[in-house]
């Protein structure tokens, strides 16, 4: 992949070969604007290949769900939303489909297909130059443009820069906060990074013996006993606590609560596992779930099964074996309470090393939502996860990455 560029011919330097950087490269190539793409990993799109468990949840067609500078995110998506991103990928030849909850995936269900389409969108363009395995260490304004410094001592100049270097989540896949720190030298405020989509560490005694078990559940996060947020989906028990998408969605609120010195707990409701109609028909509010909203229905269900099947077969065919064994000797009222309102103290998260996405980042007040251009350093365009925007699980973070990359590519191409 590495191509050595001829010096001083690039009109734009893209720092970062992740989702937003690759999108920007495609836009510049289409506009026939000469550019240089610098990526510190030896392959482009490493983090992209891991998204959606390798399936690549391309975007989400539902209402936007963003945190941090969420108003900025709304303005970005008003300028380049899911429809425009869909047209962008259609133009690259990618076929995709919508799954439940507005989630969009490539037809092949393989992230590699998305990366192939993106790479093909620029790699053979006459003005495209790519260098992989190069660590950018510095960025400075000079004259009418910028100079980029690298760990190997090479320096590259261009009138415009697209900074798409990502955030510190998942460093094994290339995550780093280095360029975010570099931007503070140019006057951009940085909101502290912390895990936004990450497994939770909890007390483990109440869930001992359930390690590796996956079940559908509602999970409610509480601060000092008050419900803050809830999520539904697959829950995975682990030897350190809980994972699965519905737990990971709550990491942001868990981190903020713990940082504020609050008692943080989760309440687990396994009503979907029990097949209770209310759980399947509507999503309860956090206050209902935290209060054991399905406890009465669970008690009725267990009472009927006890009368019909007896104690030995009470949970057979209803619960996974490991969970049934845990409840077998409990009075059914306690079992119903456990199944619809199990409380666990949250002690932390698995950290940025294991997070899918980082919250925090470069404050967006000094960045144009229409062009992603810095107001402090004109000619510098900042896009993707390095910004103080993070989205819910389900394709929202990639949608924001594509949109910001496309807008930055358009604006930098026009100059």
Where are these regions (language model features)?
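Glycine-rich FAD pyrophosphate-binding loop
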Residues: 13-15, 29-53
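Conserved N-terminal glycine-rich FAD pyrophosphate-binding loop of Rossmann-like flavoproteins
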Residues: 41-71
């Amino acid at each position: 992949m590495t191509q050595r560029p001829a010096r001083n011919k690039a009109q734009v330097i893209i720092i970062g070969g992740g989702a937003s950087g690759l999108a920007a490269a495609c836009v510049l190539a289409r506009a026939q604007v000469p550019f240089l793409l610098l990526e510190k990993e030896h392959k482009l799109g490493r983090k992209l290949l891991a998204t959606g468990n390798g399936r690549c949840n391309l975007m989400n067609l539902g209402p936007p769900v963003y945190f941090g500078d969420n108003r900025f995110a709304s303005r970005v998506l008003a300028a380049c939303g899911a429809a425009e991103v869909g047209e962008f990928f259609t133009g690259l030849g990618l076929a995709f489909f919508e799954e439940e909850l507005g989630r969009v995936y490539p037809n092949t269900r393989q992230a590699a297909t998305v990366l192939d389409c993106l790479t093909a969108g620029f790699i053979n363009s006459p003005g495209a130059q790519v260098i992989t395995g190069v660590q950018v260490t510095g960025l400075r304004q000079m004259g009418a443009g910028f100079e980029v410094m690298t760990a190997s001592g090479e320096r590259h100049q261009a009138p415009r820069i697209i900074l798409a270097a990502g955030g510190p989540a998942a460093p094994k896949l290339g995550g780093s906060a280095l360029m975010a720190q570099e931007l503070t030298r140019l006057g951009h405020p940085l909101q502290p990074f912390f895990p936004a989509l990450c497994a939770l560490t909890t007390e483990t005694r109440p869930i001992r013996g359930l390690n590796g078990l996956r079940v559908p559940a509602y999970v409610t996060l509480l601060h000092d006993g008050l419900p803050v947020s809830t999520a539904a989906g697959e829950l995975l028990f682990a030897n350190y606590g809980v994972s699965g998408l519905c737990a990971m969605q709550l990491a942001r609120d868990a981190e903020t609560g713990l940082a504020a010195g609050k008692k943080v707990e989760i309440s687990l409701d396994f009503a979907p596992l029990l097949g209770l109609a209310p759980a399947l028909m509507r999503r309860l509010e956090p206050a209902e779930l935290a209060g054991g909203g399905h406890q009465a229905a669970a008690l009725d269900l267990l009472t009927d099964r006890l009368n019909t099947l007896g104690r030995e077969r009470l949970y057979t065919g209803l619960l996974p074996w490991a969970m049934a064994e845990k409840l077998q000797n409990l009075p059914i009222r306690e079992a119903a309470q456990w199944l619809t309102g199990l409380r666990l103290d949250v002690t932390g998260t698995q950290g940025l090393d294991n997070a899918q996405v980082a919250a925090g980042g470069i404050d967006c007040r000094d960045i144009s939502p229409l062009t992603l251009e810095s107001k402090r350093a004109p000619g510098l365009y900042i896009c993707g996860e390095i910004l103080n925007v993070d989205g819910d699980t389900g394709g929202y973070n990639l949608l924001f990455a594509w949109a910001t990359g496309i807008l930055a590519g358009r604006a930098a191409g026009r100059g």
